A protein has these predicted regions:
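Glycine-rich tight-turn/loop motif centered on a GG-T
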Residues: 111-128, 182-190, 247-252
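Hydrophobic faces of well-ordered beta-strands that scaffold small-molecule active sites
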Residues: 20-24, 45-47, 75-79, 102, ...
Length: 353
């Protein structure tokens, strides 16, 4: 069965223009990544997860992670925590920031998150999980979605017990990554669980895990009944996988790869500042330039550079034609003045995902 990935669907009252969702990923899903995802076909993009404890403590770390660009909508901002009052407060701030959806993280397997009673550990405390969803759904008019794993332990089916209860508590959509927290990202995602979850709830279910091609996306949608697929690691430094999933199988040229990386560098510097961006970007060089696109020594050379101007010069020397592609990309960007940035809203963004 050939499913049209461009079909529109609704998450609560929010219209989503396509069945492809770009996953929330810690240390990855900055605004530059999300905007790129929208350009390449994602119908919905998500922020990396925001700590509600950071909001409570009014941490003065920079506010760039709550920028909402005019070209990002629809956008879900993801929050994590284990206190209903704090979650409700965070949800109100997410609404004020201009997001379209509040997403709740019940799937992060990272120990520094689960040891606080947040993330995937909430699957073992369904009562608390439901109170959190109810608190957020009551606090804001935005639709609330929940991203979760199959459970904490290998072989767990807790998602099938907890999922319907979360919907009763107010969740307008569920995203299932059918690996256990203990698996992290090893093994495979068991989408037979996704199909079971779809049969148990009357809200849209998004299938997450091991979606890296159009064929796989079509297969998962057809066999599970999910309304959409979520792409995560496959899109790191590789927006062209989103284009391929949406039906355009053209391989990117060297010039296109370099131009997109240069735009990503510039947008990240604008968002994070040059000092933070320099370290943040290093992992992206390998992601963009890998997959046989550029020699390994070239990638290693860029990682050792401490000046982003030097990185840009070296990239343009490797693909001079990228300059013209970059100019076109820059012309297509919206005016930065169209962004929403709440200077009065101190937040803290942690790792996890």
């Amino acid at each position: 069965m050939n499913i049209n990935l461009a079909d529109t669907w609704f998450l609560g009252g929010v219209e989503i223009p396509g069945r492809l969702v770009l996953a929330p990923m810690a240390g990855v899903s900055v605004q530059a990544f999300r905007r790129q995802g929208r350009r390449y076909g994602a119908g919905l993009v998500c922020s990396e997860m925001v700590s509600v404890a950071g909001i409570q403590h009014r941490n003065e770390r920079t506010l760039e992670y709550l920028r909402v660009g005019a070209d990002e909508h629809p956008l879900a901002i993801q929050i994590f925590g284990s206190d209903p009052v704090a979650m409700a407060e965070a949800a109100r701030m997410v609404e004020a920031a201009g997001a379209d959806i509040v997403d709740m993280n019940f799937g992060c397997p990272v120990k520094k998150v689960t040891k606080t009673g947040a993330g995937a550990s909430l699957l073992d405390d369904a009562d608390l999980a439901c109170r959190l969803v109810e608190a957020v759904a009551t606090a804001v008019p935005l639709p609330v979605s929940v991203k979760m794993r199959r459970g904490v332990e290998n072989g767990s089916r807790r998602c099938l017990e907890v999922g319907p209860r979360l919907v009763q508590a107010g969740a307008a959509s569920l995203t299932l990554h059918p690996r256990s927290a203990k698996q992290m990202y090893t093994g495979t995602a068991d989408h037979s669980l996704t199909a079971e979850l779809v049969s148990l709830v009357d809200v849209p279910v998004i299938a997450s895990g091991d979606i890296g091609s159009r064929a796989r996306a079509q297969s998962v949608l057809a066999t599970t009944g999910a309304v959409a697929v979520m792409v995560g690691r496959a899109a790191q430094g590789n927006p062209w996988v989103l284009r391929e999933i949406m039906g355009n199988t053209a391989e990117p040229s060297r010039e296109e790869v370099v131009a997109e990386l240069l735009l990503f560098i510039r947008e990240t510097v604008r968002e994070l500042g040059p000092e933070r961006a320099t370290g943040f970007l290093k992992k992206f060089y390998g992601w963009y330039l890998g997959r046989g696109r550029f020699p390994r020594p070239f990638k290693q050379e860029l990682v050792t550079m401490t000046s982003l101007d030097e990185v840009e010069t070296r990239l343009l020397a490797a693909a001079p034609g990228a300059r013209f592609v970059l100019e076109r990309l820059l012309d297509e960007l919206p005016d930065p003045a169209d962004e929403v940035l709440l200077d009065s809203l101190p937040i803290s963004i942690y790792g996890g995902g």
